[in-house]
Structures are given as C-alpha cells and as structure tokens.
Amino acid sequence: MALVRSLFSAKKILGGSLVKTSKAPPKGFLAVYVGESQKKQRHFVPVSYLNQPLFQDLLSKCEEEFGFDHPMGGLTIPCPVDTFISITSQLQG
C-alpha cells in the first residue's frame, strides 16, 4: 500500500499528464514522454536528474533497445510508466 501511495505522490510531483497538453516545463525541468504504447504520458523531470547515475542507466538502456529517434519530438523513454515513476521516486529522496 505504501508503494501505491509513493507512486501516486511521485506522479503528482513529476507533473504527469497526458501528451495532449502543450504546457511548457517549469524552469529547471524538461519534458519526457514515457510509455510503451502509442499513447505516451508526458512528465516533467528536474534537469539535475540527467547527472544522476540511476537516470543515466535508464536512458542508456532505452537507447540500446530503442534508440532516441522518435516521432514525438522530445525525449522519449519507452519503458513502463510504473518503472519510470519508481526510478524517479528513488531520485527524489
């Protein structure tokens, strides 16, 4: 149950929303598109995550498996949303 609560709070903090929004990320954040299907979720992550080894590992695995050439235009992370939220939750605390 605690895991479910932490996933929901992480999604709230990360600003998870549907891709249809055109809102620019806040200063110091970047938008990433997460999901394995055509309907990806847009999340805002702090730019500082790019320096974190755990986040870099996620990006490397995605690059190896899928590459970074995606039609979404932004940084696309084709992994399960729950996995992404779990990893970014670890980076928060």
Curated annotation (Swiss-Prot):
GO terms for cellular component: plasma membrane. It is found in: Cell membrane. Disruption phenotype: Reduced rosette weight and area at 22 degrees Celsius but not at 28 degrees Celsius. One of its GO terms (biological process) is auxin-activated signaling pathway. Induction: PIF4-dependent regulation by temperature. In low thermo-responsive cultivars (e.g. Col-0), higher expression at 28 degrees Celsius than at 22 degrees Celsius in petioles but not in leaf blades. In high thermo-responsive cultivars (e.g. cv. Alst-1 and cv. Ang-0) higher expression at 28 degrees Celsius than at 22 degrees Celsius in both petioles and leaf blades. Induced by light. It is a peripheral membrane protein. Its main location: membrane. It comes from the Eukaryota. The keyword Secreted does not apply. It holds the Pfam family Auxin_inducible. Higher expression in thermo-responsive cultivars (e.g. cv. Alst-1, cv. Ang-0 and cv. Com-0) than in low thermo-responsive cultivars (e.g. cv. Dja-1, cv. El-0 and cv. Kon). Keywords: Auxin signaling pathway, Cell membrane, Developmental protein, Growth regulation, Membrane. Exhibits a high natural sequence polymorphism between cultivars, thus conferring thermo-adaptation to environmental conditions. Interacts with PP2C-D1. Belongs to the ARG7 family. Provide a mechanistic link between auxin and plasma membrane H(+)-ATPases (PM H(+)-ATPases, e.g. AHA1 and AHA2), and triggers PM H(+)-ATPases activity by promoting phosphorylation of their C-terminal autoinhibitory domain as a result of PP2C-D subfamily of type 2C phosphatases inhibition, thus leading to the acidification of the apoplast and the facilitation of solutes and water uptake to drive cell expansion. Functions as a positive effectors of cell expansion through modulation of auxin transport. Involved in thermo-responsiveness of plant architecture. Enhances plasma membrane H(+)-ATPase. This is Auxin-responsive protein SAUR26. It comes from Arabidopsis thaliana.
